[in-house]
Regions:
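An N-terminal, well-structured beta->alpha segment
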Residues: 1-20, 34-37
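Active-site cavity-forming subdomains of large catalytic enzyme subunits
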Residues: 76-186
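Glycine-rich oxoanion-binding loops at beta->alpha junctions
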Residues: 1-10, 55-104
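Flexible, glycine/charged-enriched surface loops at secondary-structure junctions
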Residues: 12-16, 53-61, 158-162
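Glycine-rich phosphate/diphosphate-binding loops and the adjacent beta-loop-alpha structural elements
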Residues: 20-33, 175-185
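Residues at the starts of beta-strands that form the adenosine-phosphate
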Residues: 21, 55, 126
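Gly/Ser/Thr-rich loops at beta-strand to alpha-helix junctions
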Residues: 28-35, 63, 106-113
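Glycine-rich phosphate/diphosphate-binding loop of Rossmann-like nucleotide-binding domains
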Residues: 12, 29-58, 66
Length: 186
């Protein structure tokens, strides 16, 4: 079962143990903007592995939450606990003894330690943590500071302040178009 879903070339390489097989553990989800680059990473990693005559498989996904999204909500109580769940999910993903190395995809002070703790259950495997890079806010800091200062002085209202923090990198039903320059709303 460990390679049944692979395409023909990868399936044969894994079955015959002809090449290294990388396990990918990902924290990608559609909700967290910082994770949006990870959507395409598994396919890119698989392509790069094939170019090196190796294979790569997504071993599993781990839950990912953001304190910024759950602040003031009951879910915030789960933030630190999530690290242990992520560690367990990572260990389960790697437990099939199919992999020669592991690539962990995740960002956050709970997610990365959870990935590390789980991957260390298989400490014999070389592991790599691949960051998605900095999370730009879509507005320059000078513009954010300007709007916040005007709000503090009472010169702009709540609506203008909220415009300073539009969603970015990904969208939802309420968003018409997102770019790093501007977000337009439905």
């Amino acid at each position: 079962h460990g390679f049944a879903a692979c395409d023909g070339g990868d399936k044969d390489r894994i079955r015959l143990m002809e090449a290294a097989n990388l396990g990918i553990v990902t924290a990608y989800n559609d909700m967290l903007s910082a994770h949006q680059p990870y959507r395409d990473y598994p396919d890119k990693i698989k392509t790069a592995a094939r170019e090196l005559a190796c294979t790569a498989q997504v071993a599993g996904g781990v839950p990912a939450m953001c304190d910024g999204v759950t602040q003031g909500m009951p879910g915030m109580e789960l933030s630190l606990f999530s690290r242990d769940v992520i560690a367990q999910a990572t260990a389960v993903a790697l437990s099939h003894q199919m992999f020669d190395a592991v690539v962990c995809l995740g960002i956050c002070d709970k997610i990365v330690p959870g990935l590390l703790i789980g991957a260390l259950h298989f400490g014999h495997l070389p592991m790599m943590f691949l960051p998605a890079g900095p999370m730009p806010s879509g507005l320059p800091n000078s513009e954010k500071a300007r709007v916040r200062q005007l709000y503090a002085e009472g010169k702009v209202g709540r609506a203008e302040l909220l415009e300073e923090m539009p969603p970015y990198q990904g969208g939802g039903e309420m968003i018409e178009r997102v770019s790093f320059e501007r977000t337009t709303w439905n």
